[in-house]
Amino acid sequence: MRLSALEMIEKTTSESYFQAQLAARAFSDEIAAPTNAKTLTKALSYLNRRELRRVRRAYQFAEEAHDGQRRLSGHPYVTHPLAVAGVLADMHMDHQSIMAALLHDVLEDSGIDKEVLVESFGEEVADIVDGVSKLATIYKTSAEEHAENFQKMAMATTQDLRVILVKLADRLHNMRTIGALDRDKRRRIARETLDFYAPIANRLGMNAIKIELEELGFETVYPLRAGLIGRAVSAARGNRKALMEEIRKSILAVLKREGIDATVVGREKHLYSIYTKMKAQRKSFGD
């Protein structure tokens, strides 16, 4: 169906608005560089002193390896591995995972050999970093295959689960800053994220990361649809939120009367989940 001139203008305006939002987010310090050495150290308060010293050495190595390199947002490149490490610190991952996050791009982007990492940080950390680099190769050789095949291959060829966790954190920060890329590259990476990385996060039970990857991917690939559903959800939220709270309290009262100590929470479906359900059932939002 051909669009009218007015519809074309509205479509272009809406897409421009969403692309501007993506770019603004990507270039902001809060998103592009959310973590620095000081805040990372604070987030790693669960580690002991020896482990923190090793993490600090990994950071210094990464800072030197990426010296002079910059992200497309203009931020020093080291802000990216710091952000990836910050995601894993929030998950209370072990110090080897944090070190690998800080070092995850030095093999590909800085011309450093794996043997150097082995000598500097041990074989365990070097293997994680090497595994993260190899995951990208697995994707490139499996791009034409079904998404599920890639997921199975990634899981099967990765002996250490921490490799996948570092890669997911890497993809999450890249998706948060995807607005710095040109439109075609944005859409390709966002499509990869929806097809491959979000399902892997789901397989691992990492629901919060899965949802964020899906939302970021959805609004990048389908900005107009994301906007329409987002506005519809906002318009309906008031009444539905009150109804959900009423139902929650009723269930809680019944449980209490039966002597069952429980916590009842309500959960709103996120935009991509609503979209996939509408698409599968061929229904509109109102249905």
Over which residues does each language-model region extend?
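Active-site helical microenvironments for divalent-metal-assisted chemistry
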Residues: 1-287
